[in-house]
Amino acid sequence: MSSDSRSLDHDTIAAIATPSGRGGVSIIRVSGPEALSIAELLTQKTLQARQPLLTRFFAEDNGVIDTGLTLFFQSPASFTGEDVAEFHCHGGVMVTNLLLEACLALGARLARPGEFSERAFLNNKMDLTQAEGLADLIDAPTQQAARQASASLQGAFSDAVNQLNQRIIDLRVYVEAAIDFPEEEVDFLSEGRVAASLLELKAALTTLISQARRGALLSRGAQIVMTGAPNAGKSSLMNQLANQAVAIVTDIPGTTRDVIKQTISIEGVAIQLSDTAGIRAATDAIEQEGIERAQAAVDTADIIIEVVDDREPKETVLYSSDNAQPLIRVLNKVDLSGRAPGVLNATDQEDESVPPSVAVSAVTGEGIQALEQVIIQCLGMGEAGTTSPFSARERHVTCLKRAEAALDEASDRFEVSQAGELLAEDLRRVHAELG
């Protein structure tokens, strides 16, 4: 059964389309085969598609609920692809609920969360990636995330995947043509076009994965955990990055017992910053619990910031992580140590293989801007906050990586065997992974 015919079996749904609470305007949306009849009964007017009309809204007892704007969108030229009616009333909580109840009394049922978008998907008004882009746009934590979610809603991500998929199909057709003409197959496959095309596809897929990773990061926000010895200045650093007093700062080691979280934005990237308990031999059960929570936070972080007192730079932090997250070493308290603030040059570091180090003062703010730039670079955003042209989800990254693995396998096998049949089958698998 096609998605279009499936949608015709749906009943008519209604819901409040605007946030709850008081406001200037509230919108009730109705979608389904009875949308027009409900709208005309509610307004006691004859409605024309795409012609806004100022109407009164009537209750079951024929009393007037409110006066507002009514719009009707005829299938398939609507958000859901079905007949849709919208009622724009004054934004009081009670009047909005009364208008919704009137719609339900006339035969609509209350929509499930996300059901309007679901119907739009089932009616081919948007694909799944666009539907997810819509959700990301609604939940966007920053301006940059909103821009990218809007791009995905307009089809930017879908177009990028579809274009890559078409190139894979074109190459497979070329290879299958060589198989159909066996006397020319060797010439077809050995002339270098196939090998060059495989390299180009691998490069394009690598770029797409990188963009999707950054898009996913912007959609969900980055998790950054600060760890270090007690009194290294983690709480002061958190307050400096958040530009407000989030964590309690004292000279007493072990003041922070629980994980303190604060959402900040650096160059349009939403970041949940976590200040954790200082790592040391615990003096009591409460401190031990704080240290264990710190370790749990480290294990799920996108970036770990190790904060050390620059007056004791040899001090090491005793934590472990099974993940390969980027690590940034922050040498704090340069206002006391005398070191120049900023990113350390390779010659300033004892070992070039160690993570990037940034000298800062969490008290004066010196070096904080340099630290923010290092954070952006470690998140893969590149210079000056370069980011993805679309939003994405972790599942998208996973699917793209599976396609990349299949393409790598196809390329390696072809390099060894030069067998067109195997390559065509491998390309079919890559195509399937991309969907």
What are these regions (language model features)?
Residues 273, 307, 330:
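Generic enzyme active-site microenvironment
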